[in-house]
């Protein structure tokens, strides 16, 4: 993200936090649906015992869902541009398996990989000078290079009845096309909210030509039987 849009983004969320404090409203969510988004993002992967990177983590509230799903058997690393949000997250989620850092995801040099990488809401703000489509592509590529199992991101859909001047709505078809450049193991969900969707990109897209079924899918099914 360039300096202009980075500064504007920081200012936007800093002002929201000063106005609303610890509240989804500070992050632009105001309809009580944040928990649904978190549950959807974590639905594609088995999270127990896994390392999770949360891009644009805000307060890190996805930890509530992770804790419930895994009985606290996970490690978490949240990264966000805004100091105030990170500090709030640190004060609320104090555990040895939870870390936070204030940094730009695209600029930060990671020294580790993560099993699962998630992001909620980071593509929804319309930039002033940065190209939103290129930003999405850069984040997808870097995240996929850093994960070992897969990524899960959500978006505002362009299949809407209206849109605000400050929001950016992505085409599900375009995002699906970007995903297929990275893997064949893809899932797109638009079955939980009419104007939002999530993309899941699995790292392992290997399969046996004899049955043409993804190996990871067979492992998942075998655990259920």
Question: What are these language model-derived features?
Answer:
Residues 32-48:
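Conserved alpha-helix/loop element of class I SAM-dependent methyltransferases that forms part
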Residues 127-140:
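A short, conserved alpha-helix within the catalytic core of class I
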Residues 147-156:
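Conserved beta-strand signature within the Rossmann-like core of class I S-adenosyl-L-methionine
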Residues 116-130:
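A short SAM/SAH-binding and catalytic strip from SAM-dependent methyltransferases
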Residues 53, 61-99:
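Class I SAM-dependent methyltransferase SAM/SAH-binding core
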Residues 58:
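Conserved glycine-rich SAM-binding loop
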Residues 107-112:
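Short conserved loop adjoining the S-adenosyl-L-methionine
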Residues 1-22:
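N-terminal, positively charged/glycine-rich alpha-helical extensions of SAM-dependent methyltransferases
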């Amino acid at each position: 993200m360039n300096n202009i849009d980075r500064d504007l983004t920081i200012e936007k969320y800093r002002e929201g936090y000063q106005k609303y404090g610890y509240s989804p409203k500070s992050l632009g969510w105001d309809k009580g649906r944040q928990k649904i988004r978190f549950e959807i993002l974590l639905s594609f992967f088995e999270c127990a015992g896994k390392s999770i990177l949360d891009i644009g983590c805000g307060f890190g509230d996805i930890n509530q869902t992770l804790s419930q799903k895994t009985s606290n058997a996970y490690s978490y690393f949240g990264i966000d541009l805004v100091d105030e949000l990170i500090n709030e997250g640190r004060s609320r989620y104090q555990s040895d398996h939870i870390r936070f850092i204030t940094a730009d995801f695209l600029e930060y040099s990671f020294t580790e990989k993560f099993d699962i990488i998630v992001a909620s809401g980071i593509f929804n703000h319309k930039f002033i000078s940065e190209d939103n489509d290129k930003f999405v592509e850069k984040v997808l590529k870097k995240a996929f290079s850093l994960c070992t199992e897969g990524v899960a991101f959500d978006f505002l859909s362009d299949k809407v009845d209206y849109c605000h001047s400050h929001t950016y709505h992505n085409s599900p078809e375009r995002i699906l096309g970007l995903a297929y450049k990275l893997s064949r193991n893809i899932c797109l969900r638009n079955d939980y909210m009419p104007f939002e969707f999530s993309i899941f990109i699995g790292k392992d897209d290997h399969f046996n030509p004899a049955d043409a079924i993804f190996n990871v899918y067979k492992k998942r099914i075998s655990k259920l039987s």
